[in-house]
Regions:
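Helical element adjacent to the flavin cofactor pocket in flavoenzyme catalytic cores
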Residues: 147-205
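Central helical "cap/lid" subdomain
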Residues: 199-248
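Active-site lid/adjacent beta-loop-alpha segment flanking the redox-cofactor pocket in flavoenzymes
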Residues: 239-329, 333
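Beta1/beta-strand and adjacent pyrophosphate-binding region of the FAD-binding site
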Residues: 7-21, 38
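Glycine-rich phosphate/pyrophosphate-binding beta-alpha loops
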Residues: 56, 62, 152-157, 256-258, ...
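Short beta-strand to alpha-helix junction loop
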Residues: 69, 99-107, 147-166, 176, ...
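Dinucleotide-binding Rossmann-like beta1-alpha1 core, especially the glycine-rich loop
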Residues: 55-134, 254-259, 263-265, 286, ...
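Glycine-rich FAD pyrophosphate-binding loop
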Residues: 30-51
Length: 355
């Protein structure tokens, strides 16, 4: 029989959600000198959607100075977190290439690159031939150019989360797994605590980092959070013979996808232009590590673009594949939000991030 956790009666901050967002929030609050921080996770760390995130670490692409600075900081953090905590992050600075397939995108990406250089990112415009040298499987006969950041790359999302969690614990944060938040206590329009099956924790601040479940958690205190889960797909090929090691991540917005190495094969990820909503009435809470059965009929035409007419020289091995259908979080504006959702105090929300 599992011993019930012994929760503190009070914490200055209670963070709900143990994915990469929740552990990062805990780590950074503690790094800023905040004390008496508690993180609650319903299942295990990473068990929501973090565990199957693609792990792309990309600084290129934003025309927001704030977003660009966050990306730069994050890349630096992932590079030093292992030395700080002794926990690997899986950060591999293998490079990132975004390809422009027409004149309009070329003009757009040149503007983005100019802004990113202004912000201190070393973006290089490279020729189609150089794209193929870096990513030999790329089809480059119909692209205008690539935009290459050598220092970008990929991480292991589970390792990053564990490293952030370890760093948070080293700074005094208490992390409790297997403890769901079942209610948010309030008085006079302010949060006063969090209810769990193991007792209430009185608190001054609740940070909603519940990701796919952020809307449901917000509803417990009457806060409307405008996000919705949507289906999200990727393929993993079997081993591809003679695949060069450490190829950069390649992204092609005209094919709605990206390509990166996964083991001895490739992960081919899809960003559908029209997403399919998933569980409009709320995501299930009793199933950790969600892994949904692929809808091949719906995915088929996008798969054809990615593997046949996209920027990818398909090999026979790529036809033997494992598909994955997961749930991805979208918010109404299409961007992240970090705020008090209803203007009232003590309810910060980091719940509408797509990692």
């Amino acid at each position: 029989m599992t011993t019930p956790p012994s929760l503190p009666r009070h914490a200055r901050v209670v963070i709900v959600g143990g994915g990469v967002i929740g552990t990062s929030t805990a780590y950074h609050l503690a790094s800023m000198g905040w004390q008496d921080i508690v993180l609650l996770e319903r299942h295990q760390l990473t068990a929501g959607t973090t565990w199957h995130a693609a792990g792309l670490m990309v600084t290129y692409g934003s025309t927001s100075e704030t977003s660009t600075e966050i990306r730069k900081y994050t890349r630096d953090l992932y590079g030093r977190l292992e030395a700080e905590t002794g926990q690997a992050t899986g950060f591999m600075p293998i490079g990132f290439i975004e390809v422009a397939s027409d004149k309009d995108r070329l003009e757009e990406f040149r503007r983005v690159a100019a802004f990113n250089r202004y912000c201190g990112i070393d973006v290089q415009e490279i020729s189609p031939r150089q794209v193929q040298e870096l990513f030999p499987l790329a089809k480059v006969d119909d692209i205008e150019a690539g935009f290459y950041v050598k220092e970008d790359g990929r991480v292991n999302p589970v390792d990053v989360t564990m490293a952030l969690g370890k760093g948070a614990r080293m700074r005094g944060v208490k992390i409790y797994e297997g403890v769901p938040a079942t209610g948010v206590l309030q008085k006079n329009g302010r949060v006063t605590g969090v209810r769990t099956p193991y007792g209430d924790v009185q608190t001054d601040f609740v940070v909603n980092c519940a990701g796919l479940w952020a809307r449901e958690l917000g509803a417990l205190s009457g806060v409307a959070i405008s996000n919705q889960a949507a289906e999200h797909y990727y393929l993993i090929t079997e081993t591809i013979k003679d695949l060069p090691p450490n190829m950069p991540v390649l992204e092609d917005p005209s094919a709605y996808g990206y390509y990166r190495q996964e083991g001895g094969g490739l992960m081919v990820g899809l960003f559908e232009p029209v997403c399919a909503p998933w569980k409009i009435d709320g995501a299930p809470t009793d199933t950790p590590y969600l892994d949904l059965e692929p809808d091949w009929e719906r995915m088929g035409r996008h798969e054809e673009i990615l593997l046949r007419s996209g920027k990818f020289h398909a090999r026979p091995e790529a036809d033997r594949r494992r598909g994955a259908r997961t749930a991805r979080l979208l918010c109404r504006s299409g961007t992240q939000f970090h705020r008090h959702p209803d203007g009232r105090r003590s309810r910060p929300c980091d719940g509408a991030l797509d990692h």
